[in-house]
């Protein structure tokens, strides 16, 4: 369910050494399954463990997850990254905003999941987003761009070289991707 790298485990172990004996960590999602979902990690003293929690045992510690957060933390990864600027803890939870869909789910749901969990987080860096409007009987995914993508001069490259390539690779049943956005360039546009 959750991967905690050795570097992150070592970091947590150092922090936990200064806490009450038996304290572990809790990984959680606030507003799971919504666009405002946020993940977090906190200390979990022994008296804060609930009977409904899932305990994930790692080499150096245990992580507790409340039952509501469990499905939204599938495939999550916690790492401790060090570079020239310093060190930071990273928590990637691709399913926090939208629960992972089954491979047998309808094509529309599977495409929507990929857009929300993989494409939109990349577009969000530019204040943009994309929404699946429909999948035509001919197998075309009809998308609408919003935010910083609306009116952006790079939207065609993003559509063809990024989104379309990724969707066609993941979903061979799709024949292409089309943009139905009426682009209006303005201050909101990224480029």
Swiss-Prot record:
* Top-level taxonomic group: Bacteria
Cofactors, names only: [4Fe-4S] cluster
Q: Which GO terms describe its biological process?
A: iron-sulfur cluster assembly; protein maturation
Fetch the SUPFAM superfamilies from UniProt. Answer: Fe-S cluster assembly (FSCA) domain-like (SSF117916), HesB-like domain (SSF89360)
Q: How is the cofactor bound?
A: Binds 1 [4Fe-4S] cluster per subunit. The cluster is presumably bound at the interface of two monomers.
* Residues involved in [4Fe-4S] cluster binding: 149, 152
Query: What Gene Ontology molecular function terms does this protein carry?
Result: 4 iron, 4 sulfur cluster binding; iron ion binding
For this UniProt record, give its keywords in alphabetical order, as a comma-separated list.
4Fe-4S, Iron, Iron-sulfur, Metal-binding
A family per Pfam: NifU
Listed transmembrane segments:
none
Q: How does it assemble?
A: Homodimer.
According to its UniProt entry, what is the function of this protein? Involved in iron-sulfur cluster biogenesis. Binds a 4Fe-4S cluster, can transfer this cluster to apoproteins, and thereby intervenes in the maturation of Fe/S proteins. Could also act as a scaffold/chaperone for damaged Fe/S proteins.
PANTHER family tied to this protein: FE_S BIOGENESIS PROTEIN NFUA, IRON-SULFUR CLUSTER SCAFFOLD PROTEIN NFU-RELATED
Family indicated by similarity: Belongs to the NfuA family.
Which protein, by its recorded name, is this? Fe/S biogenesis protein NfuA
């Amino acid at each position: 369910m959750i991967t905690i790298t050795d570097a992150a485990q070592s970091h947590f172990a150092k922090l936990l050494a200064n806490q009450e004996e038996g304290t572990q960590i809790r990984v959680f999602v606030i507003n799971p399954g919504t666009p405002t979902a946020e993940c977090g990690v906190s200390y979990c003293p022994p008296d804060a463990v609930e009977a409904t929690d899932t305990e994930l045992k790692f080499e150096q510690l245990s992580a507790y997850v409340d039952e509501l957060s469990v499905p939204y933390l599938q495939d999550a990864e916690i790492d401790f990254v060090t570079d020239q600027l310093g060190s930071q803890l990273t928590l990637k939870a691709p399913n926090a905003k939208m629960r992972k869909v089954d491979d047998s789910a309808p094509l529309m749901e599977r495409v929507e999941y990929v857009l929300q969990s993989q494409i939109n987080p990349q577009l969000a860096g530019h204040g943009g987003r994309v929404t699946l409007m429909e999948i035509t009987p001919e197998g075309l995914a009809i998308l609408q761009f919003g935010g910083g993508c609306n009116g952006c001069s790079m939207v065609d490259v993003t559509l063809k070289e990024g989104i379309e390539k990724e969707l066609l690779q993941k979903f061979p049943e799709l024949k292409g991707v089309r943009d139905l956005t009426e682009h209006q360039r303005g201050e909101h546009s990224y480029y």
